[in-house]
């Protein structure tokens, strides 16, 4: 999505894809997705408003996944963790209820193997709320190189266990 919340796929092409993955938090693309000089509170607000905007669009949500909601694309360094932490439960609940109503999939892809315990809890909080609100999940490695796949099974097994995911929680296309 660009800074005007326009996704990079035109409606006439939706039918050409079995699955459409849309990242709402690529805020590291200064000038394209955001101004680039936002503070943590502004980035948290952008996280919410961009997901909300996506959920308002006329999309084939039965085959749309929202990519890597808790990754560093929100803000560099530890800023992304702070931004995720200051989003209220009420905002998460509102957004994930809407996601459930729309039928969109929520991607799980953070790397718990390289994340300390306190930070894992920051990552898990929105996903726990999403699960409570009835969202469905899919796994995405976001791998940019083959060696990344080496630990993915362990990673996803652990994330699924931490969230208590069952077959009924799967996003099925």
Name the predicted role of every residue range.
Residues 1-102:
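Extended substrate/RNA-proximal surfaces in nucleic-acid metabolism proteins
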Residues 79-173:
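Charged catalytic cores and adjacent phosphate/nucleic-acid-binding surfaces used
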């Amino acid at each position: 999505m660009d800074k005007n919340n326009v996704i990079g796929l035109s409606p006439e092409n939706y039918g050409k894809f079995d699955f459409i993955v849309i990242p709402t938090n690529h805020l590291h693309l200064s000038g394209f997705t955001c101004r680039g000089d936002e503070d943590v509170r502004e980035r948290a607000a952008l996280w919410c408003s961009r997901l909300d905007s996506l959920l308002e669009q006329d999309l084939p949500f039965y085959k749309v996944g929202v990519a890597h909601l808790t990754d560093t694309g929100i803000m560099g360094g530890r800023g992304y963790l702070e931004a995720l932490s200051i989003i209220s439960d009420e905002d998460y609940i509102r957004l994930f209820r809407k996601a459930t109503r729309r039928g969109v999939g929520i991607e799980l892809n953070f790397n718990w193997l390289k994340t300390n315990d306190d930070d894992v809890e920051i990552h898990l909080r929105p996903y726990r709320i999403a699960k409570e609100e009835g969202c469905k999940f899919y796994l995405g490695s976001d791998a940019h190189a083959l060696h990344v796949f080496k630990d993915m099974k362990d990673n996803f097994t652990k994330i699924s266990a931490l969230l208590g995911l069952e077959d009924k929680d799967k996003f099925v296309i």
